[in-house]
């Protein structure tokens, strides 16, 4: 038979002692339960008192420090993280913390709930409940000077409108449905110098996006033009233009833009400085039937002097031509 080592003997002795103490405690507890009915062992009263006191103390400690992470002392002004219910009987205040759970009902919460119920009943029954009595003096009706009062109201309204009109810059408004970025012109009559904005609404020049200082420069417009049809410069609607345009320079007014609308030169994209037919793409009918420049894409310099060299130069044409390939026959 193998000999026992000292460690194994020590383990056996410890197990035996624990088992003996456990059995004795179990027997004592069973005897105490029987003594409650028969009152045979007065020592059990002391055991039960100590047990109840320990349970109460552990419960209080568990309610005070239950499911939270605290940094420092849990007094008024300290910060901690708590996970659980709040206890109203604690000697410290629970503030500046992150809590997950329902708190115990407080007096303020009850007052808020009662006020919400009163407001809901007031809305349902359409009754007026006066919460406070104001200590201010009752307003006096000045029936002596009604005209003076009306005049002051009108003056105030005009003043507010003027201030709003002067401060209409660098803002986004969705009442009049536009977004404007830039400075407002100092002259109120000059409506064409409003620059760098996008407007969508009921405006004389409506539904467009403009970027620049001039009237017809670097903007995209979509919609009807309110001016008369007789004005040729105002007929440019539904187009996108990029460049410097002016009323005096006709060549500069129609350069580097894409236009879509009812225009003699309509539905085309042009890139160049001159009003001649150069460096552009046009799609549509030309009002002059004898002119050969329709439905084509041309890239090159155009001029009026050298007709042969400029008529059929670096372009792609799709359509019928009035002059059928004069350059090819002459070449």
UniProtKB/Swiss-Prot annotation:
Biased composition annotated in UniProt, kind: Basic and acidic residues: 146-158, 282-296
One GO CC term on file: extracellular region
Annotated InterPro entries: FMRFamid-related_peptide-like, FMRFamide-related_np
Record has Lyase as a keyword: no
BP GO terms, sorted: neuropeptide signaling pathway
Keyword hit for DNA-binding: no
Signal peptide stretch: 1-25
UniProt keywords, alphabetically: Amidation, Cleavage on pair of basic residues, Neuropeptide, Repeat, Secreted, Signal
Pfam families assigned to the protein according to its UniProt record, in alphabetical order: FARP
Region feature (Disordered): 122-158, 282-310
Cell compartment(s), UniProt: Secreted
Sites bearing Phenylalanine amide, chain numbering: 71, 83, 100, 174, 181, 200, 211, 222, 242, 260, 271, 283, 299, 318
Annotated propeptide span(s): 26-65, 86-94, 103-168, 184-194, 203-205, 214-216, 225-236, 245-254, 263-265, 274-277, 286-293, 302-312, 321-331
Family: Belongs to the FARP (FMRFamide related peptide) family.
PANTHER family: FMRFAMIDE-RELATED PEPTIDES
Its job: Excitatory neurotransmitters that directly modulate chromatophore function by activating chromatophore expansion at the chromatophore neuromuscular junction.
Protein name in the entry: FMRFamide-related neuropeptides
Source species taxonomy: Eukaryota, Metazoa, Spiralia, Lophotrochozoa, Mollusca
Gene name for this UniProt entry: FMRFa
